């Protein structure tokens, strides 16, 4: 019995031990170990403790076969290790092999750079040394040097392309064969640099050893490098591969032996062999890879996290495979692409990618300069990344990935025709709650005729379907906010609840540029968006057609908010050449004519973009008021007519402009000629009314050959009620004989114009981003923003309560300051003797300058403003430097009347407003220095030479001009009938007899 019992216990223990062994062997076949590497170590050590570390990456690579799941290979912080870490072993799920760090201090550096030593003088300031490694780039104190090049700076330009094989530049006058073997770095498209070796040079023709991707054309920039005879400028180097000699002309002509120099030689910092699984790369600084910082192909569950990767020639990280994670890394100063992710079901989260592809010609050949490239990834989540300063596109996306809570700032810094996010081959992609801003567009080395084409979100010309773009803030991009290229395969696109703000051409654009043929309709949904423009040149939305004269129905547009405080025309439709036409719509017209955006709204805020600080000329328009005739004005073509008429809503005479549609595609009404100067500013104002509603253009028309418009046209509206317009015009050409021109394109149009003024002025730009302020929360937590005591309004016009606003994560809010940015306003009533008619109680309008002065001697000027008083004598003037509750003298200056001051003691602003009326009582004027006409008090006329008195010198000026029958807008014309005559002389003579002078404190 005892024997049987013993056998039973023996059998029990056998099975128990077998189970334990089986469990341990399946859970962890070999116990994991930690290995240490330190600059103070030795490769003869066992590496398994901090006190017995290895010292080189070479040793780590040699031991790779011994590593097992769960092992940690740790590099000491603060140390630097040279070489390429080659990972060939896999871990297990939850038991990965980890390559990381230990200790304290800066991340350990795995560098692909060596420091060339033992430099000797080659010639002059050029040094040389033997260098046996293949190198790609040279750095001094962290700054990249140039490969010896021609020209030493700037660019040469192609004259014409020779298909895909080369180009011609007649300026290349070197002997045949001179450029053979050189490298040519050339821009071949807006979006592309290519790098090719010259196989043959002859008589200005450059032939490449292999074809470029993009056929070459006229006026693209290029330079040659990589020849020893080009080494003639500091900061350049040349590497002679056959002879293994490195030549260098150091910055400042310094001795390279005294400098910190790094030559990039290792192809990778970390290379994971194909098929490797379950490996973590963490807490390392990977630097100076000749190709990529981290490279992997077709592996599974590779994680790269908390690393810093810098100065790679091509990619910071490139991972292909399944289940990879790229998280919380800093990738910076990579010459081509920050991250390339061709992965399935991956995660790219929390990375900061800065300054990628910013050295022209040194990035990828034909395609590159990108922050994050993931257009071939599938099922990958891309979240909480920051892309700052990319040579080309910030993100390149496709398939069915999710990109949300990312910040993309400053893209297209080196190239053009791209944007913050570019998409291709989409089926299920979601772009949500990102902040995309400042796509620049660089045309420096592209043909001068090319346009800036920089976008927030850019649709490629590939199949795109089942796409969601929602909740994004897209701002300050130099061309278009969202560019929708409607190919024939575009399907099920949703653009919802985005904020598009201050994108320089249009907030959103729909085009059929890449369609194979006309398609009548698309099922895109565009709803709930804010399209906020900040310039009269910008529109909220544009529809463009290339393939038909009939517009496609680009989708369902509704419940959007359109705003442009500087232009009421917020939607544009264009038929592209050869049958070009363009029409801009106000929202009401868009709704009624097109039938879209029926529940959308338009902002009622309206602002000026400039404040006039000084008027530098008299009115250039010789007949601005049409009191008697339309002299000085002409019209064209034959179907157009102009006539002087009296319109009850305008001020006496006006000019009627009518066109029956005959003679041309539009009519013109043309003023007298006047000089304009490129870059100067001119204030234009006018009053208009129509018998019905319609549109008209205004522009400066040039007299110069091949120059038609002096700057872009402006489109305005005439209605059955009076509208007064004023704007600042900045010509882009100097012209001795510009004309103020209006035009109508719609036949049977008719409107009336009056009070046409054009003055040369000094201006101060009013910051439109402060008037309509965008508050962006770029964090993952709700943020509070102080309003700094400014009274803002919401977009619906309601007041913002309190001094703090709450903005949710990765979102934005636009608030409007319609309080003139707290600009004090003087509402002034004044009349000038010669211009005022007491019978009609109307005056001719004219320009007036007002100084606000200190009330204490010497009465210094505190601020000034310029305005035009209307036919009632009212002018509104904005000031910048005055405060409520402080008394100021009001000093009024008019071109041919005596300067006039407000009454003794001064006046003060209240709530930034001061109302002052010189016309009701003489006591409102300092020294009662006014003349009564009818029931009103007027400033004395006649101080033509502005010397402070109406006297003989003024009479002499008027008499001389009257004798020559002078006409036009002249200071001598005191009653403003455009004729200097006895009537003007009489006014001045009476005031001279009464010794009228300026009376001031």
What do these predicted ranges mean?
Residues 36-297, 580-616:
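Extracellular polysaccharide-degrading/modifying enzymes targeting complex plant/algal/animal polysaccharides
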Residues 922-931, 944-971, 975-1001:
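Alpha-helical segments with a strong preference for the paired helices of cellulosomal dockerin domains
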